[in-house]
């Protein structure tokens, strides 16, 4: 549990530095692209999982 706290703290610090440093405007487009790629990969994974007939617990 402590590991998760440290991980999210580091992520929050990096996001704060980038957000207040003016880099946020440039990274919004990259974040959008990564978001849509993640959605596509999720959908492909779901379709392949359903096609194979596996049940996930």
Swiss-Prot record:
Principal cellular location given in the protein's record: membrane
Assigned GO CC terms: plasma membrane
InterPro entries xref list: DUF1328 (IPR009760)
Subcellular location: Cell membrane
This protein's record includes keyword Translocase: no
The entry's keywords: Cell membrane, Membrane, Transmembrane, Transmembrane helix
Disulfides per UniProt: none
Pfam families: DUF1328
Membrane topology: Multi-pass membrane protein
Ranges annotated as spanning the membrane: 1-21, 30-50
Annotated family: Belongs to the UPF0391 family.
NCBIfam families listed in its UniProt record: PRK13682.1-3 (NF010228), PRK13682.1-4 (NF010229)
Name of the protein described by the UniProt record: UPF0391 membrane protein BRADO5617
Species this protein is from: Bradyrhizobium sp. (strain ORS 278)
């Amino acid at each position: 549990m402590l590991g998760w706290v440290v991980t999210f703290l580091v992520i929050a610090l990096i996001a704060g530095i980038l957000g207040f440093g003016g880099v946020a405007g440039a990274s919004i487009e990259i974040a959008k692209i990564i978001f849509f790629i993640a959605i596509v990969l999720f959908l492909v994974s779901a379709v392949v999982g359903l096609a194979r007939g596996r049940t996930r617990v």
